[in-house]
Amino acid sequence: MSERQKALDTVIKNMEKSFGKGAVMKLGDRTDRNVSTVSSGSITLDSALGVGGYPKGRIIEIYGPESSGKTTVALHAIAEVQRQGGVAAFIDAEHALDPVYAKNLGVDIENLYLSQPDHGEQGLEIAEAFVRSGAVDIIVVDSVAALTPKAEIEGEMGDSHMGLQARLMSQALRKLSGSVSKSNTIAIFINQVREKIGVMFGNPETTPGGRALKFYSSVRLEVRRAEQLKQGQEIVGNRTKIKVVKNKVAPPFKVAEVDIMYGKGISREGEIVDLGAEYEVLQKSGAWYSYDGERIGQGRENIKTYLKENPEVRDEIDQKIRKAMGVGASLEEASAQKEEVPVEDKLFDDELE
């Protein structure tokens, strides 16, 4: 062994004594090089994300205009984590979470940890405490724009508080980023959009809370309504576009189109109809759809109703589509094979706190 290697080994041993085992290692020695994920609750979005779902131990931003479906997308992620036996927390800074709607989306509201903070500092401190515990699998903050700094709440209505929220988010994310990675928690921040004044060229839209969240996010999703869905004259939902505008774990800029039905969330049946026809699992002739050589209905909405009434056929088609797309296990398979993380790996060493 050369003198250089001996010197390096000595330095590494000293660092491990000071900061704990694993403080420095070769990248090739890591056992978690493959990105571990949780399904988003949508086959199309799982495919657009490139790795089969939301990456664990990463920060994710979901932003878009009002009533575009941002909270719905986040609640579906919570439902998937809970279905696999995970623990979820929701920081409701907007004080607007509808428990009945969350339940309709599949969220176990009896076991969802909820906080409605009085100000931004309190909300982010609670989020950090949840993450540092190592016992929470997913945490959602709704929304960044509603994380009002304490000084602004206690001040007068017309007072100027330039850059306070951006400073708050920057400080919080510096503390959160390492904890999120070590605890393998998925941290989802929902954000609104604002318009910059005086922009003549390019997109005038921006997100509140400064630039820090843009930098620290591994995945950024832009959610926008595309068109209304009707049954006769009644509007029953929206066709929604979800664009992956930033992705550190797969190629970005892919777009997922989903049906978000009022009171029910993302329509799994709608995705199965569209993707089934695209990947030729379902055969389409004019307005008629066939499966395994047998006609099952005419028109997209009628096929969605048929699949709702025949869950065995729906699940069978779902699995064939996932196999054709190369996207992870189906929802039922995922529930049966929850990956257990040893407690000693999840909890932080007291010496590091």
UniProtKB/Swiss-Prot annotation:
GO terms for cellular component: cytosol. ATP binds at residues 64-71. It holds the Pfam family RecA_C. It is found in: Cytoplasm. PROSITE patterns: RECA_1, RECA_2, RECA_3. Keywords: ATP-binding, Cytoplasm, DNA damage, DNA recombination, DNA repair, DNA-binding, Nucleotide-binding, SOS response. Gene3D superfamilies: P-loop containing nucleotide triphosphate hydrolases. Its main location: cytoplasm. CDD domains: RecA. This is Protein RecA. It comes from Macrococcus caseolyticus (strain JCSC5402) (Macrococcoides caseolyticum). The gene is recA.
